[in-house]
Amino acid sequence: MGSTTDKIKGNANEAIGKAKQGIGEATGSDRLKGEGVVQEVKGKGQQAMGDAKDAAKEAIDRAAAAARRAAE
C-alpha cells in the first residue's frame, strides 16, 4: 500500500472511529464507544505508516542524489 493510500484510509478510519465514539456516547453504548476508540487508533497508525513511508522514500532519494554527486 502506498503512503497516500495509508494516509487516506487512516483519515477515514480515524473519522469513523470518532463518529462511533460520539454515537456510542449519545446512545450509552459502551461497545460502540470501544469500537470507535479501536478504529480511531487504527487510523492514526495507518497515517503514521504513511508518514514513515514518505520519510523513508525521501531519505533514499537524498542518499541516491548524494551518491550520484559523489560519483561525478
From Swiss-Prot:
Biased segments, Low complexity type: 35-47
Cited InterPro entries: CsbD, YjbJ_sf
Superkingdom: Bacteria
Stretches for region Disordered: 1-55
Family matches, as Gene3D superfamilies: YjbJ
Family per record: Belongs to the UPF0337 (CsbD) family.
Annotated protein name in UniProt: UPF0337 protein bsl2407
